[in-house]
Amino acid sequence: MQVSAALLCLLLTTAAFSTQVLAQPDSVSIPITCCFGLVNGKIPFKKLESYTRITNSQCPQEAVIFKTKADKEVCADPQQKWVQNSMKLLDQKSQTPKP
């Protein structure tokens, strides 16, 4: 009787862990980066180096994370015109061949 109770406990534990892994597969192996606050003002383009779009459904809001030349990360609203323009310019800059 003790063996079957232990086996049942082991099976329930395994089943519970399996559903957690299946329900949230990206939380197991990939860390999630979210923005909880957005910058109010415009960041000059000359200070920007790159960007990353945050569209993860587990984050409270969509955002763009700009990496500055000073190696800082700043969250911005992707709906703002200056953010969209900066992303376009950074895309063009990254596609321009360097001599």
Swiss-Prot record:
Modified residues (Pyrrolidone carboxylic acid): Q24
Keywords: Chemotaxis, Cytokine, Disulfide bond, Heparin-binding, Inflammatory response, Pyrrolidone carboxylic acid, Secreted, Signal
One BP annotation, GO: chemokine-mediated signaling pathway
Bridged cysteine pairs (disulfide): C34-C59, C35-C75
InterPro entries given in the database record: Chemokine_b/g/d, Chemokine_CC_CS, Chemokine_IL8-like_dom, Interleukin_8-like_sf
Compartment annotation: Secreted
General function of this protein: Chemotactic factor that attracts monocytes. This protein can bind heparin.
PANTHER family listed in its UniProt record: C-C MOTIF CHEMOKINE 8, SMALL INDUCIBLE CYTOKINE A
Protein name: C-C motif chemokine 8
Source species of the chain: Sus scrofa (Pig)
Organism placement in taxonomy: Eukaryota, Metazoa, Chordata, Craniata, Vertebrata
Gene this protein is translated from: CCL8
